[in-house]
Amino acid sequence: PHAVVAMAALERKKPVYVQKPRTHSVSEARLLTETARKHGVVTQMGNQGHSGEGARILCEMVWDGAIGPIREAHAWTNRPVWPSGLEVGRPEETPEVPPDLDWDLWLGPAAERPYHPAYHPAKWRAWWDFGTGSLGDMGCHIVDPLFWALKLRYPVSVEANTSQYWPAFFQKADPKNEMFPRSTIVRFGFPAREGMPEVNMTWWDG
């Protein structure tokens, strides 16, 4: 996990340039921020799209008023391209760990579970214990230009819908609900800011 490696560097007072996803939770993000401040260390999260010419051109167009006031924005990805929303629980098979994989190191701070190719490589993104789903995986790339161009900060409202509804998950009563859904729609409402009107941004995946 990036947060674990980043924390180890920060505690040694080393500057950190960390790739996304920087953390797995909000609490981890806050802990990294506090540690960086404590040691006076410069940090930055990498996002290659933010350095691209396309993002800068978008900002210039919006800031110059080329397309007028923006009150609605949409962001979409075809993710997940890995198995998601499976209501089958964890794999029961326990195949051997590949010889070139340190499974304990790979798990990091996540709870212990046997190795299975349903998690690694790549498919870990779909599991709550390891990934952040489609929004966490691609949102920082796709939504970043909108945040930059529209000078967005914190939303005043958020509404989410998914392709699956599992009341038991929120009560931690059903062990089968450990994966992110196949698709989601998330609507964010942002207030007026810096001469720009209120804007609604909708995230679509699946």
Tell where the protein language model's regions lie, with residue ranges:
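Rossmann-like dinucleotide-binding domain that binds NAD(P)(H)
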Residues: D104-M196
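Beta-strand-loop-alpha-helix segment that lines the small-molecule cofactor/substrate pocket
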Residues: A3-S51, G65
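Phosphate/diphosphate-binding loops
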Residues: A192, V199-G206
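NAD(P)-dependent dehydrogenases' Rossmann-like dinucleotide-binding region
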Residues: A66-S84, P98, D102-R113, V156-W166, ...
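A catalytic-pocket lid/entrance helix-loop region that shapes and gates access to the active site
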Residues: K38-H39, G89-W103
